[in-house]
Amino acid sequence: MTPIQLIARRLNLREKQVEQTIALLDEGATIPFISRYRKEATGGMDEVAVAAVAEQHRQLDELQHRKAFVIETIEAQGALTDELRKRIDESWDSTEVADIYLPFKPKRRTRAQMAREKGLEPLAQRLLLRPQDDPELEAESFLNDEVDTPEAALQGARDIIAEQISEDEQSRQTLRHIYTREAVITSKAVKGKADTPEAAKYRDYFDWSEPLKRCTSHRLLAMRRGESEGVLRVTITPADDDRATEQVARRYVKPGTRAAEQIELAATDAYKRLLRPSIETEFAATSKEQADEEAIRVFATNLKQLLLAPPLGQRRIMGIDPGFRTGCKVVCLDAQGALLHNETIYPHPPKNETVRAEQALRRLLKDYAVEAVAIGNGTAGRETEELVRALHVEGVEIFLVSEDGASVYSASATAREEFPDYDVTVRGAVSIGRRLADPLAELVKIDPKAIGVGQYQHDVDAGALKRSLDQTVESCVNAVGVNLNTASAHLLTYVSGLGASLAKKIVEYRTAHGPFGSRRDLLKVPRLGAKAFEQCAGFLRIVDGRDPLDNTAVHPERYDIVQRMAADAGMDVPALIADPEARRRLDLKRYCTAEVGLPTLTDILAELDKPGRDPRGKAEVFSFEESIHSIDDLQIGMILPGVVTNVTNFGAFVDLGIKVKGLVHVSQLADRFVRDPNEVVRVQQQVRVRVLEIDEARGRIALSMKNVE
């Protein structure tokens, strides 16, 4: 089976779809470009399907390199047969390749190797091949200076047999089947650690056991974290060790023969000392990998929802980074997000300069014609919100904005480059203000892991996490589109086909030559060639440019089709964009070619319906319950407004405007069964919740979204 056939089977796609998608990827096309502008080639595959093909292609490519290494290593040992090469070449299962390689894999000096050095290999083979012979008698002929008793000879033979059993593919497969069906994951507190403060959060796992196949990703990752911190000891074993040993031994032990006891001892040793630890390690790795995949999926879903949160748009904004002792950092931004003014006010304890702070805020709101105020939701956030609302300034909207990652940004090289003359507090306030105006444009400057929507993000595979999050950011940026004349280099970096180097070149060119008047002007940017232009042009927008199509997602390679449509309708392109009736009268089949079919033509008309539209909607004003300031103010049964901050497999965390986030367990999300919480809620969604339980000692709040109307 070829890699293309294998991917097609795994993803339930046609081979032609996979073949053409891989060809496009190998030519340097990006996932957003392929899914948006090459629908005819892929058979209409969406971004998720294209990404899945790309990931499978990457994994199989890695396996191909591994297979080449295995063949080379075995060949160097002079042990490569035609049959062995054929098996490796035809295998697309990494576990099978590992099993084939195992007997040839260089290893530390083992008990079996030491026994072979003593000349005991023939004895081991006699026990296996002539089990009717007397083992004691056979062992007599192998005594020498290093082997002084028959039992020593038999022990060495058993060591050789044990290693042979542990490296036998069939033995390993037998135990794998047992693990797959009935493996149990067990967690115990490490002796002397249970009463330590750091162990408290793992209390649920001090004496925990469940079938591995039922262990959810968050439980498994919690146990593994406890293990890495030295609090828990985690094992994965068959439900019945004796039965597993018997099944492994069955292939080798011939009941009733004289050698049966020796072979059984060797098989038991193989199972306990070599085989079970090896398969346990394998299942620990695969179960962790599966848990990682699920945690990364949850993280990527949350990140996507956060990045695609509705923007307020180009408005004059006041950003406030609240604080008590250090004061509140206040900045005023123009409609493009440029910093106009900054100062610090001290309305809260210990200074309590409330009147002076109110006067300063009124002055700034007026002087800079502020249209909206963005207040960080961290320390002193609620108190600052109440202060600003009490001013009752007409025409000014007030928003609490997530501070997650703002401090990371403010101390970053990007922030220093943007604001070299300001300290971290001013940069943080600017980030909060800009985050309200355009969450996507601001959040791309921050490492996604610092945004606070991950589930065990520090415990999962770092490489897989980075690939997924980078792909998520790229997907969001290209789904929205980017204003070529206002976008930062950071935002442009994620545009299809660009990257950091070309993004910087675009900004440098824009600074030197002024705004771009046309997408075609991109070709004047140094080192931006035809391929990069093909990949990026459709995702870049020029507002009020020379060609109205430059403010749409219509790709420049298809402008001629729109021009033909306009000519056939007896008008120019701007008139066609403004005339929905004329567009409805068009017969799309007239414009079909070998390269361009109805999917692309339908997309073109959809773009002409709403040129330059932002798919994210618009930010809505939200207020927390004014009487709630801490967990002490909560009462069971209260119905409160909240904002979803994180969605996990087991439910959703909700911000109630206090330090402690509440949890709506998956069973409390709706009056029906919910398999995936993302079916019901999303990050940044405004919800109403009912307080079910309050555990002040552990800082936990249980909430429900049932019966809250």
Predicted regions and their residues:
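A glycine-rich phosphate-binding loop feature that marks nucleotide/adenosyl-phosphate handling sites
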Residues: H177-V184, I320-F324, G378-E383, V401-V408, ...
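Short, ordered loop/turn segments at secondary-structure junctions
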Residues: Y37-K39, L128, A239, P322, ...
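Structured, non-catalytic alpha/beta "coupling" segments that mediate domain-domain communication
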Residues: T73, R87, A98-Y101, G226-D240, ...
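Generic start-of-chain signal for non-secretory N-termini
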Residues: M1-E19, D26
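Duplex nucleic acid-engaging cores and interfaces of nucleic-acid transaction enzymes
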Residues: F33, A49-A52, Q59, L63-G319, ...
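Single-stranded RNA-binding regions, centering on S1/OB-family and related RNA-binding modules
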Residues: I542-R546, D550-E709
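Long, highly charged, low-complexity intrinsically disordered interaction regions
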Residues: P3, D61-A79, D89, V408, ...
